Amino acid sequence: MSEITRNAIYDYVASAITAVHTNVRCTSRYIPVLPSYPSCYIHEIEHYRPLENMQLDYEDVQWQSSFEIQVISNKKGTAASEAYSIMETAKAAFNSLYFRELSETSIEGTETFTVIGRFRRTIGGGDSMPKS
């Protein structure tokens, strides 16, 4: 078992998505116009904060980790169902890491359909990633 880091969480969720949806392109970098669809953008929301212990120090204590995932599809007619299907896979991956879903919203554009989900969990100093 390995230590929980933002990269380990990204790798775990991206691998879970691409194992089920082989045509999805996952990235952790924001690209304004993604060259291929369907795509998912997974990133940690930068406003996480460490939680202090009773002695008010921050060593080996808990911290809040929040992630956002954007699933973007442009298939005419099936964009919504495809995006929601990919998001369900992402939810299952985040749930297996004990994240809870904070919100989900969708945006229907003229050319694309986007589903956005946010997830959060408290991570302790001794937590580790599950074996895949």
Please report, for each region that a protein language model flagged, where it lies by residue.
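Charged, amphipathic alpha-helical segments and their flanking helix caps
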Residues: M1-R25, H47-S132
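A short, hydrophobic beta-strand-centered structural micro-motif
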Residues: Y37-E46
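Short acidic low-complexity segments
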Residues: T27-P35
